[in-house]
């Protein structure tokens, strides 16, 4: 019997700066998908890293997490160790064999997620988008028309901008909450698949030292 490959699209919200080698995650969300369907989602809050008294959290974010903690579908873990165990079990229960994120060099290298996915095949969705859509004339025109450029003059490829392109909705604003972001990143990945083009696996976007293996899946 043929079994479709299951992918997990993962997003984390963390404390810490861009230069930190490890960032404590207070929110982890993931979506298990095949090429045809969404199988499952998980929404984890890590209490030991959720410092609601900190100025780091704006008023809107504090209200969001207060409400989230009351949601019965949310898994509340008191420590990162507990979150690792819960998340690893979810990956196993869903037979996940490949993990994906938009900017894997952060989510997969600087959070507790790295211990849950050790040895798994992975895709950087930002890299996949660059390989399949980001270099097309249509995407370049889209960025030109809307002013979506980096400081160095390159087309922006944040999850928010990529999702705006694949949905043709320039008003979309990314939530920057883990599960919601994983859902939009799953749709970006599906748009990459729809091109039927090869893209890179097991390498982070911008990690040019890694061997770039292009494959169709």
Where do the language-model regions lie?
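Conserved non-catalytic scaffold segment of RNase H-like nuclease domains
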Residues: 2-112
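Acidic, Mg2+-coordinating catalytic module of metal-dependent nucleases/exonucleases
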Residues: 98-104, 109-110, 147-217
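Hydrophobic, well-ordered secondary-structure scaffolds
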Residues: 1-2, 12-21, 166-170, 191-196
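Substrate-recognition/cap helix-loop segment adjacent to the acidic, metal-dependent catalytic center
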Residues: 105-126
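Short, glycine/acidic-enriched loop or turn micro-motifs at the edges of active sites
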Residues: 14-16, 127, 184
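Short alpha-helix plus adjacent loop in nuclease-associated cores
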Residues: 124-151
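Short, polar/flexible loop-turn hinges at active-site or ligand-entry regions and domain interfaces
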Residues: 71-74, 115-118, 169-174
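Generic enzyme active-site microenvironment
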Residues: 9-11, 122, 185
């Amino acid at each position: 019997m043929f079994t479709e490959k299951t992918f997990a699209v993962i997003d984390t919200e963390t404390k810490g700066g861009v230069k930190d080698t490890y960032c404590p995650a207070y929110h982890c969300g993931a979506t298990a998908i095949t090429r045809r369907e969404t199988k499952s989602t998980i929404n984890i809050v890590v209490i030991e890293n959720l410092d609601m008294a900190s100025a780091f959290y704006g008023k809107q974010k504090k209200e969001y997490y207060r409400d989230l903690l009351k949601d019965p579908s949310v898994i509340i873990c008191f420590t990162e160790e507990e979150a690792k165990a819960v998340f690893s079990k979810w990956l196993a229960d869903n037979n996940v064999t490949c993990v994906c994120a938009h900017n894997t060099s952060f989510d997969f290298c600087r959070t507790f997620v790295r211990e849950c996915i050790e040895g798994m095949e992975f895709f950087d969705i930002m890299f996949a988008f660059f390989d399949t859509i980001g270099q097309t004339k249509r995407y370049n025109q889209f960025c030109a028309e809307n002013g979506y450029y980096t400081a160095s003059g390159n087309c922006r490829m944040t999850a928010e901008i990529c999702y705006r392109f694949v949905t043709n909705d320039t008003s979309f604003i990314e939530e920057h909450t883990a599960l919601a972001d994983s859902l939009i990143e799953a749709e970006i990945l599906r748009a990459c698949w729809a091109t039927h083009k090869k893209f890179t696996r097991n390498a982070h976007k911008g990690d040019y030292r890694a061997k770039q293996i292009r494959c169709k899946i």
